[in-house]
Amino acid sequence: MPVSRRQAAAALAALPLTLAAAGAAQAAAPVPAPASARGPGRPRREGTVFIAGDSTAAPKTAAAAPEAGWGMALPVFLGHGWTVANHAVNGRSSKSFHDEGRLAPILEAIRPGDLLLVQFGHNDEKTGDPARGTDPYTTYQDYLRRYLDGARARGARPVLITPVERRRFDADGRARPTHGEYPEAMRALAAAEDVPLVDVQAASLAEWDRLGPGGTLEIFLHLAPGEHPNHPEGKQDNTHFRPHGAVEVARMVARGLKERRLPHPGALRRLDDAVPEGVVTWPAG
């Protein structure tokens, strides 16, 4: 009897390898690509890029500025006819996002040819929290399959995205990985399920290493006292992004999609352009 993808994934999983945002429903409304990203001529088709993820991708309101998720910047890299429906929510894992019923509205809205970008890991690592924690090669992969299966059953195309790295350096100033076995477990699942994977973990680790401890301060949410009214005492956050950081991580995602010819050749724009921070905006609420 032929071995199914699910059986193959289960066998692979057995190998010993290595925060809620207010106004989430409003934030998940599709955001069209900006006019500056529109190319000439008639688009091949219109579609939506859905995002399921955590705070590193999630939309923020004005009260959280200048913090920004990479999903807020993704529309600038999409061509005419493509929109972003950012359902990512602060503090969620692959498990809690699903168990809270947040995957269901995505699957109700998604259409054939749309993309579902799935990026979890930061909160799956919190294994002391039964509502969020998962094991890399068992429950993490099991929950991720629910996103893959749901999208594929509706003719949409799921894409796994490894979790973006935090800002952590060793004594020699080299960027260090922080996600344990979760990125490798996602890579293994993508191979077993034959779905595209954008390796943002590897791309971001290399970029943070290139920028170094000083350069990454412009990526992450490090603010001096008095720099922003929402954080009068300043802030030092090595997980979440300033607008520039959100743009650069969105660029990593967009480049990975283009390499995989998703959603189709020519759908991605401005991948090598200087993009101003002003493309990121925060709705009131």
Language model: regions and residue ranges:
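N-terminal secretory signal peptides and thylakoid transit peptides that target proteins
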Residues: 1-15
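C-terminal region of N-terminal signal peptides and the immediate post-cleavage residues
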Residues: 19-38
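Serine-esterase "nucleophile elbow" of acetyl-processing enzymes
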Residues: 34-88, 104-112, 116
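Glycine/Thr-rich phosphate-binding loops of Rossmann-like dinucleotide-binding domains
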Residues: 59, 94-95, 126, 169
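Structural motif
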Residues: 93-101
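Alpha-helical cap/lid subdomain in secreted, periplasmic
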Residues: 102-247, 251-266, 283
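Short, flexible loop/turn segments with low-complexity composition
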Residues: 262-276
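Short, low-complexity, Pro/Ser/Thr/Gly-rich segments in the mature regions of secreted, periplasmic
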Residues: 277-284
